[in-house]
């Protein structure tokens, strides 16, 4: 299970501080999710926190 950030990312940075496992970081043009680290917030929240705060709705299942 993992998520990814699509090219629609606006580089707003809302998602990065929401990740409890620090799987989100700034790429060159968009934020990226380390798919090997992403847990979709299992054990931390009922649903992925980054998805809830993304204004561009660009965080999807990998």
From Swiss-Prot:
Domain 4Fe-4S ferredoxin-type positions: 2-28, 29-62
Iron-sulfur as UniProt keyword: yes
Binding site residues for [4Fe-4S] cluster 1: 9, 12, 15, 54
SUPFAM superfamilies per the UniProt record, alphabetical: 4Fe-4S ferredoxins (SSF54862)
Organism domain of life: Bacteria
Cofactors that this protein relies on: [4Fe-4S] cluster
A Pfam family the protein falls into: Fer4
Cofactor binding comment, as recorded: Binds 2 [4Fe-4S] clusters.
Keywords in alphabetical order: 4Fe-4S, Electron transport, Iron, Iron-sulfur, Metal-binding, Repeat, Transport
Listed GO MF terms: 4 iron, 4 sulfur cluster binding; metal ion binding
InterPro entries for the chain: 4Fe4S_Fe-S-bd (IPR017896), 4Fe4S_Fe_S_CS (IPR017900)
Job of this protein: Ferredoxins are iron-sulfur proteins that transfer electrons in a wide variety of metabolic reactions.
Protein name listed in UniProt: Ferredoxin-3
Protein's organism: Chlorobaculum tepidum (strain ATCC 49652 / DSM 12025 / NBRC 103806 / TLS) (Chlorobium tepidum)
């Amino acid at each position: 299970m993992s998520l990814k950030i699509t090219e629609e990312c606006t580089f707003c940075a809302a998602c990065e501080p929401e990740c409890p496992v620090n799987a989100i970081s700034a790429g060159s043009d968009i934020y990226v999710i380390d798919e090997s680290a992403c847990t979709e917030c299992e054990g931390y929240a009922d649903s992925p926190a980054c998805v809830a705060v993304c204004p561009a709705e660009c965080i999807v299942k990998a």
